[in-house]
Amino acid sequence: MRPALALCLLCPAFWPRPGNGEHPTADRAACSASGACYSLHHATFKRRAAEEACSLRGGTLSTVHSGSEFQAVLLLLRAGPGPGGGSKDLLFWVALERSISQCTQEKEPLRGFSWLHPDSEDSEDSPLPWVEEPQRSCTVRKCAALQATRGVEPAGWKEMRCHLRTDGYLCKYQFEVLCPAPRPGAASNLSFQAPFRLSSSALDFSPPGTEVSAMCPGDLSVSSTCIQEETSAHWDGLFPGTVLCPCSGRYLLAGKCVELPDCLDHLGDFTCECAVGFELGKDGRSCETKVEEQLTLEGTKLPTRNVTATPAGAVTNRTWPGQVYDKPGEMPQVTEILQWGTQSTLPTIQKTPQTKPKVTGTPSGSVVLNYTSSPPVSLTFDTSSTVVFILVSIAVIVLVVLTITVLGLFKLCFHKSRSSRTGKGALDSPGVECDAEATSLHHSSTQCTDIGVKSGTVA
């Protein structure tokens, strides 16, 4: 009982907790086609703690050069005011500082400050001004933070002491290739879980390792992972041009399912695409059946379901024909447990068993999705040590009980052996006495015989 209590008391010491003043639900991320991703975090950290937090996520404290980098940061800021609700100006740590050997340069745009990670491709200085002019100094190290008006509009740079706390920080991540945003089709409730421990409902580009989950009609849950190859990246189980969830109609708009009247809108401010198994007609608005696949629009075929068992787990194969479903209730039902959401700064990710789709094309135009259930993976607190400790404790207790039992049996047998020997000795003593008496009687009878003989002789 005491070891178990001690283990329970030690659990909080090893279980990671969010940092002071963190607001993980307000964090957000964005990626550009160049392979750079940025994340914004609301947390009252010092400069060094902010650098460690970015490093823990696999990135560095962000620079904010002009051009695409500034636009990405601007997009993150304008996505929402954050936990303050836009009631005050916010400060965010960036990788801008002035070392001890550098002096204040009043005529330079950065006033003698420099970026920790210079960008050769985007070497132009940031267009942001200084909210307050830095103090003149050549002997004191100073840091700079990005000030955002009401937390959404960048106002400029502000000199700060590095040991002070700000309202948040910006991180930057660099990847060689990215996956484009998947086409949702009829999918809803999209959630992107990025490898730098942030989740988002929408990402134009996703780095390798990102997992996307969505709900299809009929409460069917699907997921896919961005996988990197030699020179490109793609979503696992999704062929180019396919969607996460098939549409119940024949038309697509920007990768999403649309109704027929919307697609045939006379304004012509968008283009129409056809679902799998159909092709766009000559008029550019109607969908026609592909001749080589010999599909018909009459009726709807019910999906077939084959369930087989493999050593890795149950695999469910679902075949969706080229025709589409008019009733969502006809879709096969699959129960899946997913855990998506924003994580805190520290690495506390835990995933539940997931079902990953693999799409296979057939000559008949059908699309087959293979859902394989993988075992749960725990990336944080492992309970195997607790199980081992309990098993070892039980084994020790059983060994002690067996030892005590064996000693008791040995002691009992020893006492029985001594008592049996004592009884046997007592029985042997009367026998000796009987033999002595018999010998004495025999000797007396012998004497009597001799006396009788002698008497006869005398007579």
Swiss-Prot record:
Glycans are attached at N189, N306, N317, N370. It is a single-pass type I membrane protein. Residues 246-288 form the EGF-like domain. PROSITE patterns: ASX_HYDROXYL, C_TYPE_LECTIN_2, EGF_2. One of its GO terms (cellular component) is external side of plasma membrane. Disulfide bonds join C143-C162. GO terms for molecular function: carbohydrate binding; extracellular matrix protein binding. Residues 408-459 are cytoplasmic. The modification Phosphoserine is found at S440. It is found in: Membrane. It comes from the Eukaryota. Residues 33-173 form the C-type lectin domain. Its main location: membrane. Residues 1-21 form the signal peptide. The chain crosses the membrane at residues 387-407. One of its GO terms (biological process) is cell migration involved in sprouting angiogenesis. Keywords: Disulfide bond, EGF-like domain, Glycoprotein, Lectin, Membrane, Phosphoprotein, Signal, Transmembrane, Transmembrane helix. Residues 22-386 are extracellular. This is C-type lectin domain family 14 member A. It comes from Mus musculus (Mouse).
